[in-house]
């Protein structure tokens, strides 16, 4: 009887010890979890373009690789450094800056936290703990420019850029070169939403510029303008003209009016650097994404299959192959400066 009583009195302690063991094990598991901090640019995760693609890549990594992901959206350019620093101070394993505007902030914080791992999209930072993820946007722009010229009935097409900077000029130059390779007489109208970071998040301005181009005779407009591009899509719907999307596959947004999207696989870049870092294979340096490794491409799906004709697709595939082989040399604004 006494032994039984002692057993009953001892049981709660066993339960408590077991519970403590489980708690400590869970805590250790949480501490061992690979943590990713994602700093989005001004357009935010709902821009349906550049930032949305980056966010999707991180969410894919969360689901497929089991990493922890926390994302933040910058309210203005001054917010980048504090957000990046906060992730570094909280011992996040990998911190990713989305967009060239974060170059200075990522570089500064990376130097102050040399044991942390960083990555940045669209900028090159020469630090051993920073991976620079760069894209050959001019290749994709050339390709969709050719597609636009092959499709246009008016001999006039348009381009609406976001912030007037070398990166977007690179899109514009490639687009015009691709179009004129098909039709040397084609007219390419080009406008930009502004010269400050506000230009990425101004749909009304994007719509105004696109309407002006459509009303001037353009029957296709390529939008490379972040969230401002949403206004270009609205203009296309209003005028019943074609639009070309950018970064993410935007064909679904206005079915039957989106001729194609120039795919800039930011999602692929974000996923790949998270996977490398999680597997202990992170290194600094530069990784480039272009047509050759499918980091750049154009879209074909159920939303544009009927308007992107088979003959145009066949020609586009031929042009793509010639760019990859080097037979076609695409002009690069970065090298023209």
PLM region descriptions:
Residues 13-27:
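Bacterial N-terminal signal peptides
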